[in-house]
Amino acid sequence: MMQSVTVQQEPAESIQVAIGLVAWNEERGIGATLHSIFDQSIFEELNRRGWKCEILCLANGCTDRTAAVTGEIFDQQSRQHPNRAAFRACVVELGERGKINAWNQFVHTLSAKEARYFFLMDSDILIHRRETFWNMLQALEDDAQAHIAVDRPCKDILFKPRKSLRDHLSLAASRLTSSAEAQLCGQLYCIRAGIARNIYLPKDLAACEDGFIKTLVCTDFLTRPSASSRIRVAEGAAHIFEAYTSPAAIVKNQKRQIIGQTIIHILVDGYLKTLPLYKQARLAYTLEKKDRTDPEWLKRLIHQHLGQTRFWWRLYPGLSGLGFQRLRRLRWRERLVCFPAAVASSLLAFVSGRLAFAALRSGCTNYWPQAQSKV
């Protein structure tokens, strides 16, 4: 079931930007997220150019008042925002829970067909800089080679005046992750609509959809070697998210990541490369049709992969020792600072990898740990 509540209507032909806010049971925290969105300078810039923006809150499988709270804020902003002429806002209630379905619905069904740029974002983050959205959009406007613009993700613990040893370890782990080129954080990014519309997320992808999108975009849909230039980091753009700090939450999150990366490996390094070029060129149509006509196809591929994989560290290439691989990209001084995080990362991979391996063998792919609290 899908129900749409439109708060403000504008002529559809003027929509240039569409923002998809994916929300699940965020009644308590979504207000802060929405206010950080409406504080963005992008609405003033769009208004100046005569452009329009639509904001869709994709409330998926919610059992609380997320949709109602969002609708109230949308109604208030549509009446009081100084640049209210530059946007329309809509709450969409999706009966099916999950980011994968919400993403597909937004990109292929719900967003304005004439939109040139999509912002995809989670509903439990805060936009840190007022110019973030506009700088991300400008990054794509100024660089024809880039298809995705990203900002800088900041853990909330970064702003603590007094950081614990665990906080420092967590921040060092983030430094290791950011050392790789072409990083795509699924919490917030801007993508050219034409590129997004050729991507369909298989329903059993489970997690790490950002890794799947990154691979397709950087390889021009698997037609050439990966090019990091397809993803552009926007200057002066950042958002804040709540860091996992408890050992249990960290292990659960890493378990989810390993499950997702395993499925991406099965798809990208296996199945998709066997497709004829004409099917790769129409990848969204190909994968959507596969999901529709053969709903169990990806689960069979996962089962087949597990039958050929004896040990957890062989779920996908580079799983073991990933922290030390990332450490080599850093300068010597940074290596010393981040060495404890690399050790912790390897130990975490050992624990989470075994749990992910067991979960996959038991047929569990739709695993999603709940955040500890709201930002």
Mark where each language-model region is.
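A short, conserved alpha-helix in the catalytic core of glycosyltransferases
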Residues: 206-229
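Short, acidic, metal-binding catalytic loop of nucleotide-sugar glycosyltransferases
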Residues: 35-52, 76
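Terminal low-complexity segments of carbohydrate-biosynthetic enzymes
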Residues: 252-375
